[in-house]
């Protein structure tokens, strides 16, 4: 083998990198264990803040770098974001104070609570009632609707424009949230537009380790403002006076407030260094500190800055900000401080030793009559993170022409002063203006890290939403089926892995089997290491990618070993057999991996959420499995053989010696029968789609989910009987009709069920949620399944004894149009490019047609099995986003299997290239299928070992996935033999037959 040195170097680098990145997971687990022994929460946090892994990395960095589990496996953050449609309307009206407009707005808000109509219809109706004879154009002929609404516009035209703008605002907010969360890569966000709740988004984020940062990221409306400022020396005397008046007891201020009221969000500007009095940092209230606070209620906590510090007036510890806010924003402060003064905190704590919890207070000057900033962020057209001339991270911005003019005027009027750059009420930077800035090019610089600038640039370039997104619901969700299911899944996966290793030894002898097993372990180790380096969270679709990767890795070793067996059978020596075995297997391995890689790359580029997570893991696994199976194992084999070791090594055992050897099944002669069988199977699936449909989860149908723990183990059928007819719709076109309600068992303890219903799902009234929970409580209590004294206790997930709701959700269709479109397009593009690659690689359309026909039929049958089987077997077969991952895995496996068969057909056709017209094409196809039959069966069995183990031993959260995979592998294996190959034969055979006739008609010269 050539380039052995390069292979060794890459292997060493991969090993070291994987050890390094995976060590963060070990370190985090160790630190968490140590911290758990500390009872005092402050001391526990201090311990975490003090640790330095390897002397360099903080606990927070360890958290960020470790490989985590996704929301479906570990839990994470679940929020509902609301983009207020009334706020959007008010923005479009330029915040007019017209009495009729304001009254109509309030009426519409009240009616929206109980009306099925959308807000715009309610508002238009209310406006016509409140202001008869007046036109909507009088309100909405604003700068925001310039070009769409004029004073001459009709009410119909205005209403149309409002609908377009509101839809655009909601879509934009969806895109904003998607773009911001996508920065986390494989974290697999689940973003849903909640049907029936206009302007609401639900966002699930697995394994979020910094909820504060995510809250800022999600709620940041990119509401950027540029403010004029006071000089600190102008404001300090006022603060001193306020401090004295407070000390005199003119007003009562609670200076013992904790920092719980003030959660500083965002980042900070560059500021001069300072030193707080150490007494201020003391944790206890000693007599001296108490006396100091009595003498100086404000300035004992807020340290002012002597000298010229521009707009920065002082510093304070974050725990003191709540008390300071009460003083500087209180009624006494309004009497003393300038009326045009606006005090805002910095966004990020001051850097430096013992100053990570210290924030700056800035003095802004209000110069407009309406109290708004003189320049706002809607003039910013682009924003990107880069570095200044000193190599420090910053964010560069470009403004539009209007903003450039206003910015030039603003900077010209404030030369020598600071301009505060404020995002959502906190100061990011307050740089000194050295001169007029023209051209619209500016930058936000300060005490930033690279991560800070990336977050800020991402927020700014996402666009300025007319109404900020607000978190109206937030919860930390546990794993889908609990820790027990996860533990079962891990155990089953481990058992499957061991069985797979034993299988390779049984089939290929101890040494070759162990070599394949070591390659498998290395593949898994490297894959996890690379995922950890990406700071990825492992999700169920990600596991799908790993499962497919293991199959690909085993497949490569099986291909190599089967070719080596063939060479040894021909009487060749071990050195030659190894060389030719690896060489002859290379093209099949390369083609099968590349077709899988094509699918993965397209899914990564066009997919979102679970599809993207699956694709990322799959791509990593494909590349690494190719390296470990093709290069690492060969390196070891050749090293041993070069030392005259393993010269008599066999690649069979007594069990496998004659397995599928010298078989000659006539597969092609039975294609009519197999086509008929496949056609009937597909027809049955289509009929099932039409008659039974699919068991779609609320991800697709909308509805309410309640995961409930019961007070005793019970049969799920008994719960179904109790819930039957309990929910009756009271609103909408289904009023008076029973709501669709399903109950399934979760876990294995018999005490956890999930109740799903579409009860009043079309209602916009939040009170319906409480009604639904009350109905659920009454029904379960009547049946004796819960014994809580009140519905309030039943709704409290912390009160498990007696039964309670431990997780709930109300959703519309999960996969919004854009995600559905991207998912469909990604699969279609993958199929198209697979078709194109096989056409170019195999130089015949027959192979392309055969592979695509096989993929389409296989996918149809897998989905059809879910349609046929749901409700008949004892576990959920719902169609959800995890199922998408399973289908993609099936497609990847099937094309891998098919390409290997095609590669052998191509090789055998090449042996007859000079007399192909006279060759027996059917025999060549049959021989090729028979020659790869051992490989086909071994690969399928080895992968099925993994999946059957997971299916039997794993929890419910992975059972439907493994079920789909089992069906897909069985069908895909048969398809590569009985569908893909015969279709290719029929297309290729006709072409060769036509060529033979043409040659036969050519006259032979005498």
Where are these regions (language model features)?
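Interfacial helix-loop-helix hairpins and adjacent transmembrane helices
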Residues: 1-21, 27-67, 87-128, 156, ...
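Interfacial segments of transmembrane alpha-helices in multi-pass membrane proteins
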Residues: 2-4, 395-396, 400-415, 419-420, ...
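Hydrophobic alpha-helical transmembrane segments of membrane transport and translocation systems
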Residues: 8, 522, 529, 566-587, ...
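Pore- and gate-forming transmembrane helices of large, multi-pass membrane proteins
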Residues: 177, 480-500, 552, 572-608, ...
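Cytosolic juxtamembrane regions of multi-pass inner-membrane proteins
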Residues: 551-595, 638-643, 873-938, 986-999
